[in-house]
Amino acid sequence: MLNRVGVKSIMNKLVLSISALIVITSCLSLAPTFHKQIAFAQQATNLLTYENSSYGIKIQYPSHWEKQENGTKQGSATDAVTFLPPTINSNASLDISIDDISDEKGITLAQYANNSIGDLKQSFKDFKLISSNTNSVLAGLSAYKSIYTHTDENTTFKDLEVGAMKGDRVYILAYEAGLNEYDKYLPTIQQLTNTFQITN
């Protein structure tokens, strides 16, 4: 028969074992987050700055990503620059464009976002809107954010579009990737978006 001292000793060991198990489990659950934070920190040390005074934009991007300056115009919008990841055969990209809305005096952010969604429906096959809001932030300004999918040449793409108004311009960052790559590059895209500035 166990005496009180023996029971107390067993209980203490049991409590210590359970406590140790909780600590170990907590550490293991935090490991993926910790590794992600290390990856982001390493990536942040290898960022280059892209600045274009003509368009009044500035953004940081990973040094191993490709930068393509475009300057092509489609209607009232100008494609300023595109950033591409280094992965071979990747279809992911971050495109920055500036839309001149001087002919649309008085248009609100919500109206612009709705018009943009309407245009996308007309332009893309199998367009499906996942979410849309006008309470996001880009470069310190109120912004709209739309997430949607569409099909192009039998490939389904997922897109994230964020746009903010300043004066007679709307500054748009559009991230596009195949469904198999979208989540892979999303943290990097979010990091780039956070560095975006309007300089004029």
Annotated model-derived regions:
Residues Q60, Q111, N115-D119, K184-Q191:
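Extracytoplasmic/secreted proteins, especially bacterial periplasmic and envelope-associated proteins
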Residues H64, S131, K145, N194-T195:
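Extracellular/lumenal ectodomain signal focusing on beta-strand-rich modules
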Residues L28-A44:
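Sec-dependent signal peptide cleavage junction
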Residues S19-A31:
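Bacterial N-terminal signal peptides
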Residues W65-K67, R169-N200:
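Surface-exposed amphipathic alpha-helical segments
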Residues M1-N12:
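N-terminal secretory signal peptides that target proteins for export/translocation
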Residues F40-S76:
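N-terminal "mature-domain start" segment
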Residues N70-K166, V170-I172, A177-L179:
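Conserved polar/disulfide-associated segments of primarily extracytoplasmic proteins
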